[in-house]
Amino acid sequence: MRHRKSGRQLNRNSSHRQAMFRNMAGSLVRHEIIKTTLPKAKELRRVVEPLITLAKTDSVANRRLAFARTRDNEVVAKLFTVLGPRFASRAGGYTRILKCGFRAGDNAPMAYIELVDRADSETEAAAE
């Protein structure tokens, strides 16, 4: 029985899922918008939002925790220097999911996941 087990399996084993979301979180922080399937986008929210909350208080301990979860110094630097101060006054809900149709090959529902206060100069074409 799978009672009270949260999160989606996404037809992957645990280590593959962990690596995939680590990479996707890094891409989202780096580019501020990415295109993926809708279930992955919904699950990615659960990974990225705590990272941004962590980045709101800049300390060595928090930077180490963020590095442990992303394994990327560039991402950690952007989290704490750009995104942490940007979302300092926001209590949560740092990401937005926009449905964008279905994938041509297998008709999978696709979505953009983006940071809410993203600069308008970047286009959605950059996400693809």
From Swiss-Prot:
Keywords: Ribonucleoprotein, Ribosomal protein. It comes from the Bacteria. GO terms for biological process: translation. Gene3D superfamilies: Ribosomal protein L17 (3.90.1030.10). GO terms for molecular function: structural constituent of ribosome. One of its GO terms (cellular component) is cytosolic large ribosomal subunit. Belongs to the bacterial ribosomal protein bL17 family. Part of the 50S ribosomal subunit. Contacts protein L32. This is Large ribosomal subunit protein bL17. The gene is rplQ.
